[in-house]
Amino acid sequence: MLENLRYIAKEEGLRRFKESLIAYSADLGGLIAGLIVFLRLEVFLSEPWIVMLYPIMITLRGNIGGIFSAKLSTSLNLGYIRPSLRRNTPLFMILFSAINFISLLLSFFSGLIVFLAQIVIVGFKPWLLGIVLLTSLSTQVISMSIAIPVTCALGFISFKRKIDPDVILYPIMSTVTDILVSLTYTVVIIVVKTLIGFIAIFSICIVSSSAILLLMKKYGREVEFVTSVKQILAPLLLSLLIGWFSGLALSNVKSKLEEYPSIMIVYPAIIDTIGNFGASIGSILTARLAEGLVSPKLSLSLLELYETIQMWLSALLYFIVYAYIAFLNGFQNVGVIIICFIASSPLILFTCKLSAIGVFERNLDLDNFVIPLETTFSDFLGTLLLSLFLGII
């Protein structure tokens, strides 16, 4: 075994470590998202529902963006979509319509379940339903209206320059969407509490929702639209439920966030890196399963073990950076941040293997299930462990 491991180490070198070190560098952009929230933390912590909804928005937007990025990349490589925003193929418009419809539907459900949780926490306030739903819908609508064109432009440019969109789209866009969601969410929760702001945001939601429903009316009967919605909706609904538990965990330590505000600076970067650690493993595994290079079993081969250790060490370096940033901003218990990753990584690895094997054996689309479920579970686990450790200290 040791001889085989030495041979693999000699053949592979530190390739995965270097690749993941570069890939995870995009997660540093999550610090910008965290800084946006940190600068208006008093507004963010003013209501339990605001704290609760934020992780759901981050998780939901990331998963929808991840699925869109994966499908766009695959379709570009297969020639089903042209690298142009104008006069593209019908499949592009069907994919565009399906993603927007699902985003609208899930943002409505997000606001609804957060409102129901708010009833349990502080009691029934009927007027709050409109504010929570409007906040959820507008955050998704506004961020989607920017994120989708940016995703398309980045995918088209990279494809034209013979750079594989599969390699760069998801890591870059996951960070971009975190920043977009954090900025949009912060602006919305400030503006929605004023009459003029409420009317303006309500108008944006009505116009955008009407446009999405018109697209659905035009393309909703297409086989590709129905198939995409059916396949994507199930894992995203599960992601939404798990994201809700993340929100509950974070809202339960609201007082600790007030005591240690610097945690919010690094929080988006923490869950991004945990998620991308799992996504890296999941992407490699799903590709090898699809190509028949590995057998569907839970145990790790020596090659998988060697690659996982490299990616784990790469992610650990970033967690040390996050701990140092939190320390510079007044958080003394820096070990909490590092332990979050160390404790969560074995469970994330197990979840990646289990979900990939389960989806593969049922002959389902790996892109639609493995990455969304893995990133959602990673977000939840990172948030849960961070909340638990904050509750203890």
Where is each model-derived feature located?
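Interfacial/gating helices of multi-pass transporter permease domains
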Residues: 37-54, 58, 253-267
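Transmembrane helical segments that form the transport core of multi-pass membrane transport proteins
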Residues: 231-295
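Juxtamembrane helix-loop transition segments at the membrane interface in multi-pass membrane proteins
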Residues: 67-86, 150-171, 257-261, 280-298, ...
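Membrane-interface helix-loop-helix junctions at boundaries between adjacent transmembrane segments
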Residues: 129, 133, 138-146, 151-181, ...
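The first (N-terminal) embedded transmembrane alpha-helix
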Residues: 18-37, 109, 238-246
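Transmembrane helix-bundle signature of multi-pass membrane transporters/permeases
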Residues: 20, 24, 51-63, 100, ...
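Helix-loop-helix junctions within the multi-pass membrane cores of secondary transporters/permeases
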Residues: 69-121, 273, 277-330
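Structural signature of hydrophobic alpha-helical transmembrane segments
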Residues: 135-147, 197-209, 336-337, 344-345
